[in-house]
Amino acid sequence: MNIIDGKQIAQNLRANIKLKVDALDRKPGLAVILVGDDEASEVYVRNKDNACKEVGFYSKKINKPINTTQAELLSEIECLNNSDKIDGILVQLPLPKHLDANLVIEAISPKKDIDGFHSENIGKLMQNKPFLRPCTSKGVMMIFEMIGVNLVGKNCVVVGASNIVGRPMACELLNAQATVTICNSKTKNLSNKLKQADIVVVAVGIAQMIQKDWIKPGSIVIDAGINRLDNNQLVGDVDFESVMQVASWITPVPGGVGPMTIAALLENTLIAYEGKI
């Protein structure tokens, strides 16, 4: 069993990005919009801001009050779309319930959509002609590359069908010529499907759902979930302590997929910058 150190892999990627940024005349610019005062979202935004500063990006944090209207938010995005200093735009999700997240995502220029959620970027990913790829699934693909996994012909099961992780992850694996099964909350006999998998990627938001006896010995298990238990402990969707006994590679939570998601975000910002040159 090998534990995948996402922090170390991400640190190496950030160091390479910084070398590229140091040679540029203008620093890539990232704008992050946070609506409201959700504590978890504030932590995520702060982590992204710190990562940007570490690699030498220009970082702009925009805090909007929780009662911000749809029109006000769209106007802010339009200003950033037209700004020469800003190469990437990120609106921190989830948004307050009175705001339409889909409308907000579609308002971001596809060329500055560093989250990779705009329908144009999702369409390019599905056509295997990606430009800005969704960050979590891209970060997972970076992990596979770093640990030397050949995905061609591998049986891969993605547990979770969200637009943020599950669906883009399935597309990434298909583009890598893997054989992909995507499961959701209605999937019957999930454990039987997982027992056939060479690679399992989980993102369902259910703490420690995936158990040791669901996993084929020697498989690779990627945990993209993050949950907080009653005792304040952060855990993933995989029962790490038991599954690590049978997996050949496994990501911890925290310290696995999370740092890689931010590394992918930084790389997307650099790609967006280079696309304007």
Swiss-Prot record:
The EC code for this enzyme is: 1.5.1.5, 3.5.4.9
Fetch the SUPFAM superfamilies from UniProt: Aminoacid dehydrogenase-like, N-terminal domain, NAD(P)-binding Rossmann-fold domains
Q: Which PROSITE patterns match?
A: THF_DHG_CYH_1, THF_DHG_CYH_2
Q: State the GO CC annotations.
A: cytosol
Task: Enumerate the GO terms in the molecular function aspect.
Answer: methenyltetrahydrofolate cyclohydrolase activity; methylenetetrahydrofolate dehydrogenase (NADP+) activity
Q: Which Gene3D superfamilies does the record associate with it?
A: Leucine Dehydrogenase, chain A, domain 1 (3.40.50.10860), NAD(P)-binding Rossmann-like Domain (3.40.50.720)
UniProt keyword Glycosyltransferase, yes or no = no
Catalytic activity, as annotated: (6R)-5,10-methylene-5,6,7,8-tetrahydrofolate + NADP(+) = (6R)-5,10-methenyltetrahydrofolate + NADPH; (6R)-5,10-methenyltetrahydrofolate + H2O = (6R)-10-formyltetrahydrofolate + H(+)
Could you say which residues bind NADP(+) here?
A: G160, A161, S162, S185, I226
Pathway-wise, it operates in: One-carbon metabolism; tetrahydrofolate interconversion
Any one GO BP annotation for this protein: methionine biosynthetic process
Report keywords, A-Z. Answer: Amino-acid biosynthesis, Histidine biosynthesis, Hydrolase, Methionine biosynthesis, Multifunctional enzyme, NADP, One-carbon metabolism, Oxidoreductase, Purine biosynthesis
Task: Tell me any Pfam family this protein matches.
Answer: THF_DHG_CYH
Q: Is Oxidoreductase set as a keyword in this record?
A: yes
Summarize subunit and interaction data from the UniProt record for this chain: Homodimer.
Family assignment from sequence similarity: Belongs to the tetrahydrofolate dehydrogenase/cyclohydrolase family.
What's the stated role of this polypeptide?
A: Catalyzes the oxidation of 5,10-methylenetetrahydrofolate to 5,10-methenyltetrahydrofolate and then the hydrolysis of 5,10-methenyltetrahydrofolate to 10-formyltetrahydrofolate.
| Name the UniProt record assigns to this protein | Bifunctional protein FolD
Q: What organism, scientifically named, is this protein from?
A: Ruthia magnifica subsp. Calyptogena magnifica
Name the lineage: Bacteria, Pseudomonadati, Pseudomonadota, Gammaproteobacteria, Candidatus Pseudothioglobaceae
